[in-house]
Regions:
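Active-site phosphate-binding and catalytic loops of NTP-dependent enzymes
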Residues: 21-25, 90-98, 154-158
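Phosphate-binding glycine-rich/basic clefts of nucleotide- and phosphate-handling proteins
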Residues: 1-76
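Conserved phosphate-binding/catalytic loops in two-lobed NTP-binding clefts
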Residues: 120-146, 154-160
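Residue-level signature of catalytic and energy-coupling elements of molecular machines
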Residues: 11, 86, 108, 144
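Structured core elements
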Residues: 22, 50, 107, 131-132
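Phosphate/ATP-binding catalytic cores across multiple sugar-kinase/actin-like superfamilies
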Residues: 74-101, 147-150
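Short, charged, low-complexity patches
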Residues: 4, 8, 12, 79, ...
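Glycine-rich phosphate-binding loops at beta-strand->alpha-helix junctions
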Residues: 99-122
Length: 160
């Protein structure tokens, strides 16, 4: 399982390894929001982002600028894990559901789904249409609520 928190950790690690700068989780989260991307060829790329942190060599605070392309590179391994999990799930999908997915596409939900270009990258990998759910931050909770209200209709989804 890979989620937005993994992306944040990837960014922290990238800043430490590539720029010798120590940043906190909040700064990494802000980088993800401001310049986070899943691909390095966005049609409308964000401007570079100024990052402030502590220089690991001198211990003195410093500022650097990072591009969305750098962040896309830093997130590549985690995004590849997501792609592989999706492909694995598709391989195990019953034929009737596969037909529906082929027709309607894949829907992404959660905060990580808002990463620029993630839908495009997954679409290229799966050769299927990929959409971001309406209100992706609340989509999973809303869907779970609907399923619980109609538990008899969704009993087949519950593992014993």
């Amino acid at each position: 399982r890979v989620a937005g928190d993994d992306f944040t950790s990837d960014i922290e690690e990238y800043m430490r390894r590539q720029h010798n700068i120590l940043i906190g989780e909040r700064t990494a989260e802000q980088i993800k929001i401001e310049v986070g991307a899943a691909i390095d060829n966005l049609e409308n790329p964000p401007n570079d982002y100024a990052v402030r942190g502590r220089d690991l060599m001198t211990g003195i605070p410093k500022e650097i600028h990072v591009s969305y392309k750098e962040i896309a590179h830093s997130l590549d391994k985690s995004i590849s894990k997501i792609e592989e999990a999706i492909l694995s799930a598709l391989e195990m999908t019953p034929p009737e559901l596969s037909a529906d997915i082929y027709k309607t596409g894949i829907y992404l939900a959660g905060g990580g789904s808002m990463l620029r270009g993630l839908d495009k990258r997954i679409s290229i990998k799966t050769k299927l249409p990929v959409h971001i759910a309406e209100d992706p931050l609340r989509a999973v909770a809303r869907g779970t609520g609907i399923a619980l209200k109609n538990i008899d209709n969704y009993q087949f989804l519950i593992k014993a």
